């Protein structure tokens, strides 16, 4: 059976890695969509082409497909809301206070070193303190930016909300994550 089926379907098989740089090129060559986010992919579920296929094969009616789309969209939006809310809360309540406390210890240590007159050690501690202070500023700015786009998303609903989550909130979350990870 495989000997017969494989040659018939070889042209649709892709033996590469779907996450590699080869896939977008291959997808375009085959005329396939290459949606990078859930928000970009979900509308395809209720496209005219998909609805026609579902109804023709008796898999779903238009109303059933729309209902599934609405449920998936709502689930995505709720999940992204939870993730963004949690990230802001954790950054404010956990990471920023710990980093600030450490910066305070470094600053006190720097004063002790300065009082002892150890110039060589002072520069190292000063560099550490500068890095921490700059990092705290970056984290604060990132929290504010994430908060702003998260509020923007919360004011919307449906597909518009999903698009803001995918294209504005997620990148803001990535920026905050990078700022915290850098310290």
Where are these predicted regions, by residue range?
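Acidic, glycine-enriched catalytic cores built around paired aspartates
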Residues: 1-183
């Amino acid at each position: 059976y495989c000997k017969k089926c494989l040659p018939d379907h070889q042209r649709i098989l892709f033996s590469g890695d779907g996450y590699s740089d080869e896939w977008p090129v291959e997808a375009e060559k085959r005329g396939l969509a290459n949606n990078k986010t859930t928000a970009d992919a979900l509308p395809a579920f209720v496209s005219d082409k998909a609805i026609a296929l579902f109804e023709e094969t008796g898999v779903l009616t238009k109303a059933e497909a729309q209902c599934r789309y609405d449920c998936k969209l709502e689930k995505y939006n709720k999940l992204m809301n939870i993730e963004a809310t949690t990230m802001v809360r954790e950054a404010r309540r956990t990471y920023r206070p710990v980093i600030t406390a450490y910066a305070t210890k470094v600053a006190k240590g720097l004063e002790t070193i300065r009082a002892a007159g150890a110039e060589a050690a002072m520069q190292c501690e000063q560099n550490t303190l500068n890095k921490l202070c700059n990092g705290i500023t970056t984290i604060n700015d990132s929290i504010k930016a994430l908060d702003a786009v998260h509020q923007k998303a919360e004011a919307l609903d449906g597909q518009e909300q999903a698009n803001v989550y995918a294209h504005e909130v997620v990148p803001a979350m990535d920026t905050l994550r990078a700022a915290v990870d850098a310290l």
